[in-house]
Amino acid sequence: MDYLPVEVIGNILSRLGGARDVVIASATCRKWREACRKHLQTLSFNSADWPFYRDLTTNRLEILITQTIFQTMGLQGLSIMMDDANKFSAATVIAWLMYTRDTLRRLSYNVRTTPNVNILEICGRQKLEALVLAHNSITGVEPSFQRFPCLKSLSLSYVSISALDLNLLLSACPMIESLELVSLEIAMSDAQVTIELSSPTLKSVYFDGISLDKFILEADSIEFLHMKDCVLELFELIGNGTLKHFKLDDVSVIHLDIMETSESLEVVDVNHFTMVWPKFYQMISRSQKLKKLRLWDVVFDDDDEIIDVESIAAGFSHLTHLSLSYDLKDGAAHYSLQGTTQLENVTVLELGWTVINDVFSIWVEELLRRCPNLKKLIIYGVVSETKTQGDCQILATFTWSIVQLMRKYIHVEVQFEYE
């Protein structure tokens, strides 16, 4: 270790990340202290990583963080993620940010202060490339002054902000490619909460825990969109057909429109979602490149509605991975049994049930027949703890049917996942 250049030692310390580990390691010898002072690139203070932080008074914690930060030169990554047990002095926190802002590329900030610290004002017009902001408040955004010319990634979690300020903040980031919005507290200006965001450079967007009346996103370069635990009346995506990956996870939306951007879709992943199948199919049908389609635990507005596998087979000829799980009602033998178009390129098939019945084995058999080049079949099932004699009989019949079926498809690998 004595022969390692201080620059290499600095890289080693930077990979440790956590301030406690960095301080302990840098105490090894003079050379390591020099590496920590001059060549440390990343430093992290996280109350979840080290319970000792919680045992310190706020003043002692401020001193510890201040001493550690001020012993460094040229930090590029700084993470200060503290729980709500401490409220720091705004002056102290501003001193940390002012000392490091000229060289910072990445900042993760979850610090409660009295009064509130305006991160945008302090870190704007600098070289920041990634900003993670949590449990904070943003007001009065001025794009001409609070500009982030190099910012590529922005994450806001549990942040209070108005719809106007959010749009202004996005416009102040001309290079932004990734946006994450988690459980925002949207300041309301009227009875209807509407957000309209526009960015020509956005490629990846993630929304979690967002509840609004209307959300309109205009993103000409978007490739990835993931929405989770959201409640919306209307969501509209406007773009140039660049969207490749679209994921919905436990989302409630009355009117969903991504049709304008769906031409390049390669992955559609929908989980716990209520849909009108004809409308949903029409929305994604423009894509001729779809490779993976996952419709899992979906519910229909109409009890008699089905997912039409014939339209999937005819419309998505490049599909290689198909996953389907929804309630197959007794007597509905027409589920997926109409039509003859095959899913020629599907090699992985995932099928699931929440309540098993006799229709399921028929459904599995028909889908196997539709996939002549299938390599892998995965069956997911929910088995209740309390089982009647009838439940056991249905499960036994299904198991026997699958055993018989797989004798015809010996080239297919079969997996069962029960919960």
Curated annotation (Swiss-Prot):
Keywords: Leucine-rich repeat, Repeat
Gene Ontology CC terms: cytoplasm
F-box domain span: 1-48
UniProt keyword annotation of Nucleotide-binding present: no
Pfam family name, one: LRR_At5g56370
The LRR repeat ranges on this chain: 53-82, 96-124, 133-157, 158-183, 185-209, 245-272, 273-297, 301-326, 356-381
Record-linked InterPro entries: F-box-like_dom_sf (IPR036047), F-box_dom (IPR001810), LRR_dom_sf (IPR032675), LRR_FXL15/At3g58940/PEG3-like (IPR055411)
Keyword Repeat: yes
Record-given protein name: F-box/LRR-repeat protein At1g67190
Originating species: Arabidopsis thaliana (Mouse-ear cress)
Lineage of the species this protein comes from: Eukaryota, Viridiplantae, Streptophyta, Embryophyta, Tracheophyta
